[in-house]
Amino acid sequence: MIRTLEIVNFKSHLASKIRLGDLTVLTGVNGCGKTAVTQALLLLRQSFVNNRLMAGLDLNRPLCSIGTGQDALCRWAPNGIISFVIGDGQDEIMKFSFDAENGLDDSFLKKHEEDSSYPDSETLTAHPLFSTGFQYIGASRWGGAVCSRKIHLQSSNNGSCHYRRDRVSLWRIS
């Protein structure tokens, strides 16, 4: 289980260390980095699913889309290296670092060789973030839109959920 997540130079996170529990609720004002916490994990997951994590980070699709390296890099970053460090609360720590400085216009950031401690592929596959049992709950911003159609959340084989119409009603309460 993921117990700590360090995010360095990613979006609004210059250097953040977050302790995670069995249930973690992220709250805060707009723009403080709540979404970026989830996006950090989803970027690692989607790069792994795309068989590209050992080479770098896919910034777009299928789980989330950030844009380019310039969109991902924190505007106050002292250098162009984006890092994510995952800890299990015991001894296992995985550090993933990516070179955003040389990929500002790219949607794929190459692995930063000098500052990463990538586990082997077998260890990655056994980790909850990269296993076939991975699940998460995401939120969409409806922005005050009125939704009168019915939808249904349907799981796909990769652990993500998709909306299917005509099953569940969503109502905007004024």
PLM-predicted stretches and their roles:
Residues 47-174:
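Phosphate-coordinating catalytic segments in nucleotide- and nucleic-acid-processing enzymes
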Residues 1-47:
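Pre-Walker A-like glycine/lysine-rich segment at the N-terminus of P-loop NTPase domains
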